Amino acid sequence: MPDPNAKRILWYLFAGTRGGINRARIVDLLKEHPYNMNQLAEALELDYKAIKHHISVLEKNNIVGKMGEKYGVVYFISNYLEANIEAFNEIRSKMKMEMNRP
């Protein structure tokens, strides 16, 4: 069941803070399948340290989870985000519309 506060949290993480666009791009990839940090950095053409920071923010807010240890860690979207994916998708589409404005 979707969390009534989820939309506020998701707006804050993705549309209300610096780095929100990159966090949304990370989630877009993780919705497809799990990735490790190096794969995310390469796919998004971002610095490894930036990915590490964004993943940390997403983990603290229960948006992503991880499996494995040390160099074998892969990240995936959390059950919380899966339950609230419609809210994320709505925010994501609004973000894309904002980016396409002249």
Predicted regions and their residues:
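A short acidic, leucine-rich amphipathic alpha-helix
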Residues: 39-43
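Key DNA-contact positions within bacterial/archaeal DNA-binding proteins
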Residues: 49
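Short, Lys/Arg-rich nucleic-acid/phosphate-binding segment
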Residues: 20, 68-74
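Pre-recognition alpha-helix immediately N-terminal to the DNA-recognition helix
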Residues: 24-28
